Swiss-Prot record:
Higher taxonomy: Eukaryota, Viridiplantae, Streptophyta, Embryophyta, Tracheophyta
Main location: endoplasmic reticulum
Protein family per UniProt: Belongs to the auxin efflux carrier (TC 2.A.69.1) family.
Gene, per the UniProt record: PIN5
Organism annotation: Arabidopsis thaliana (Mouse-ear cress)
Protein name per UniProt: Auxin efflux carrier component 5
Induction summary: Down-regulated upon auxin treatment. Down-regulated by endoplasmic reticulum stress treatment.
Residues in the signal sequence: none
Subcellular location: Endoplasmic reticulum membrane; Cell membrane
Any single Gene Ontology cellular-component annotation: endoplasmic reticulum membrane
Entries under Pfam families matching the protein: Mem_trans
Keyword vocabulary terms for this entry: Auxin signaling pathway, Cell membrane, Endoplasmic reticulum, Membrane, Transmembrane, Transmembrane helix, Transport
Gene disruption phenotype: Defects in lateral root initiation and in root and hypocotyl growth. Increased levels of endogenous free auxin.
Amino acid sequence: MINCGDVYKVIEAMVPLYVALILGYGSVKWWHIFTRDQCDAINRLVCYFTLPLFTIEFTAHVDPFNMNYRFIAADVLSKVIIVTVLALWAKYSNKGSYCWSITSFSLCTLTNSLVVGVPLAKAMYGQQAVDLVVQSSVFQAIVWLTLLLFVLEFRKAGFSSNNISDVQVDNINIESGKRETVVVGEKSFLEVMSLVWLKLATNPNCYSCILGIAWAFISNRWHLELPGILEGSILIMSKAGTGTAMFNMGIFMALQEKLIVCGTSLTVMGMVLKFIAGPAAMAIGSIVLGLHGDVLRVAIIQAALPQSITSFIFAKEYGLHADVLSTAVIFGMLVSLPVLVAYYAALEFIH
């Protein structure tokens, strides 16, 4: 049962995030410390340095031999349900959109498990719940965030059903002075995929999770410890991962004209996807695979955790609905505690 001390631990984990957010906001809005170009540089610092090292640090310390693979399978099934629904919506609905499907997937599935989920899960269901939340977070970093990067790179490469088959470009021949028309065909699927895989291969967010989980297998199989010099080299930057991400979000907010930059309707949509659609899909996947008791409850609770900060960083870097995801992170953390407590109370009736 949750008591006041447990609630305080959750608040204790969340308040420092808002301190970093306010400092980032004030550095641009009030104190004018950073220019817009410098703000973009800060986002790239977070995206390509602190977050990859943060990912290595927490994935390297998980025990992959003691994971609850039925719980992981339920998570996979819930994501498949969401992807299927979004794909059908994008293809057959008049309002369907490939870009909005990506953002909706992020809102439904990607959670802030480590910062908010761990203290809350421990307060609700004990150490077993903490282990499950950490496993979910590691799997999210390895699979779902990598998948998100793939579709973002795919979108950036320009291959979509909306591409026109040929583009006419007017060019002036300097020698003759005549205007010539050059026809540029769209890239082939193989060319686009080659470009996407090349980008992913050089993106530290992709191979950081692979390095982390590879070391986790090696260290737990042969009982090895990471040398202190390597551990320290990773920690020196990884400790700043969450703080710099929230600081960067504050900077993004300060650069916008409004505090709620995406508007009320999109904010409500984000909250519905985050706290209703995601947990509902997880509940279906968990029940289908036979989860029960506290494992079922933890599965649903962790799906209702606030929005992943990393999803905002990627959205900002790739220019896709960063306003919606920043609002989802900020307001999601504000409303998450009462929502999760309500879920906790309701799930007590499930056996």
